[in-house]
């Protein structure tokens, strides 16, 4: 049916219709319309729309058939991580996208926008925050993503400067659930430290005294 509609009008008319109406979704309806991509003045808009709405099959088709020549596939990966579309993220990585591009921006995007499934995938494939996950906790705390904070905070954690910054960021942004969680983890950590030191004093220090 869509093919019949396409054939009913000259290409030039369809281009004018799409540009004037801004109905760019029409380009995604079938393979004939998508071939108008380079004739319509909406390159960035349509690619962003494809990724944002999770049109995986459309993206796959236009890339593999070279309907769209993507000069930097990492830019598309950043969009996919921002909008949290895991199938598209996996596909782009399989096509050579760098999960550590632009100083690990893919995982930063996924963390900030709260896409835990994408974060887990990127971490499992080697994505890092400059060698540690501390910066991830700061980003997740700032944006209010408790599930991601919990993912990055290990069971035994050393509350160094980054953790204190995360607590400040969560407080300033009024993410009380994260503030409560980080405070509880901090209390738990210091309790463990106190018990460890008490045990050390009780069991080892008396033996080093000289009488």
Swiss-Prot record:
InterPro entries: Ankyrin_rpt, Ankyrin_rpt-contain_sf. Keywords: ANK repeat, Repeat. The keyword Repeat applies. It comes from the Viruses. ANK repeats lie at residues 31-61, 72-101, 103-131, 133-162, 163-191. Pfam families: Ank_2 (PF12796). The keyword Methyltransferase does not apply. This is Putative ankyrin repeat protein R810.
